[in-house]
Amino acid sequence: MAALGCARLRWALLGPRVAGCGLCPQGARAKAAIPTALPADEAAQAPGAGPGDRRRRRSLEELPRLGQLRFFYQAFVQGYLLHLHKLQVLNKARYGPMWVSYLGPQLFVNLASAPLVETVMRQEGKYPVRNDMQLWKEHRDHQDLAYGVFTTDGHDWYQLRQALNQRLLKPAEAALYTDALNEVIDSFVVRLDQLRAESASGDQVPDMADLLYHFALEAICYILFEKRIGCLEASIPKDTENFIRSVGLMFQNSVYVTFLPKWTRPLLPFWKRYLDGWDTIFSFGKNLIDQKLQEVVAQLQSAGSDGVQVSGYLHSLLTSGQLSPREALGSLPELLLAGVDTTSNTLTWALYHLSKNPEIQAALRKEVVGVVAAGQVPQHKDFAHMPLLKAVLKETLRLYPVIPANSRIIVDKEIEVGGFLFPKNTQFVFCHYVTSRDPSTFSEPDTFWPYRWLRKGQPETSKTQHPFGSVPFGYGVRACLGRRIAELEMQLLLARLIQRYELMLAPETGEVQSVARIVLVPNKKVGLRFLPTQR
């Protein structure tokens, strides 16, 4: 009854959006309104029009359409609001690999196959525009804060990106953070062993997602702000605990404020909680930036400009003159959030699947201990000799892309995609979740099989994988800014854990599914057992 009541409440909130429309979601009228699905091979493989090509290019109006009312019915009544990634699967089966959907007055063209995604990504231009960060922009405008690298577009974005790129994107620069990350991993192992000792079995951690979230937050703060904030202490500082809580608050409520009409904001608690979460995040970031500014000023006063030693990322940004403190405050919290979710969720899913697949886990351990001598700590140079470890992370990101969908607007030209001609300023949605589980691209797409990414002696070699079948870090000039750091962080921690422990699922964990809290997260606690290995 409670579930039915919630469904009725959600439906009632749509108010004037459904009033007088005669909506009958499961009746004949709804069925008759569904367009014919676009054939997958026709949409995904239609070649682009070359010079002199006289074949007819179809228009936007000929695409199958998901009506706004039907979408709201799916999200709020059928319960897909926290399962929008699975809604991609449903809609692709119904409409084909390309369909139109609406949110308010905004039209979206959804792309759900690797060739279609590639076509758009390769034509993004110098200043790719994304229009899926509007909620973040509303908060920045509300508090008169500078936009960051995720919320800025055009030439301003390009300049900001260039300033932030210097110490993050180049592999050689990212490798410089190895010692800092290993320091945080040392603390993580201590905390993990404390939790194991506290468990009834003496070897169990009840909630790996939570522990890895604290690890990822500690690591990215140490890199960006050059300060340990105590996330892995047995007793976490109050300010840090409030910050951690506020990040969850912001993400959880952003799901609701994205789809609920604006007139509900004064009536329901979601909008205020969303703003409060962001306010705490920025307050925390501002305190860390202010502390670093005070350190820089103190160095200048004591040693002059020639005596200032650039120690890390934030120090470099503030002393280079490329970013003002206001601009740094706009971007660093955004980088922080991106870094936390990428590593914590991916590592949670990786450990979960390794626990379920002991043969793969044993092969990975053999690889790691064959490269890293007993008693030694993995270093960045070691991963050139660990193809299976890289494949485990790549396969995890294929199954669980951190962001299951994102969007781009092609602003400077019309574009042909799959035989359809789209005007300038068309907004495309990349449906990463369903694309990376496409059976035409990946054999047994729902199976965790890291060997598909290795070249020799694996069944997948009989099929050519499409390079855009899984693009978890994006592509081109707007690819993930922190990719190199995230990869290094995940490689270092996964290698250390496999080196030290045999992983097993806790008995109460069972089967874990994903839910979309903007990012893909487990729907329940992932409890694991860590049994020390004999070396």
Curated annotation (Swiss-Prot):
GO BP, one annotated term: glucocorticoid biosynthetic process
Pfam annotation, one family: p450
SUPFAM superfamilies named among the record's database cross-references: Cytochrome P450
Keywords of this entry: Acetylation, Cholesterol metabolism, Heme, Iron, Lipid biosynthesis, Lipid metabolism, Membrane, Metal-binding, Mitochondrion, Mitochondrion inner membrane, Monooxygenase, Oxidoreductase, Steroid biosynthesis, Steroid metabolism, Sterol metabolism, Transit peptide
Cysteines joined through disulfide linkages: none
Cellular component per GO, a single term: mitochondrial inner membrane
Transit peptide range per the UniProt entry: 1-36
Cofactor or coenzyme needed: heme
Domain of life of the native organism: Eukaryota
Family to which this protein belongs: Belongs to the cytochrome P450 family.
The protein's role, per its UniProt record: Cytochrome P450 monooxygenase that catalyzes regio- and stereospecific hydroxylation of cholesterol and its derivatives. Hydroxylates (with R stereochemistry) the terminal methyl group of cholesterol side-chain in a three step reaction to yield at first a C26 alcohol, then a C26 aldehyde and finally a C26 acid. Regulates cholesterol homeostasis by catalyzing the conversion of excess cholesterol to bile acids via both the 'neutral' (classic) and the 'acid' (alternative) pathways.
UniProt protein name: Sterol 26-hydroxylase, mitochondrial
Lineage, highest ranks first: Eukaryota, Metazoa, Chordata, Craniata, Vertebrata
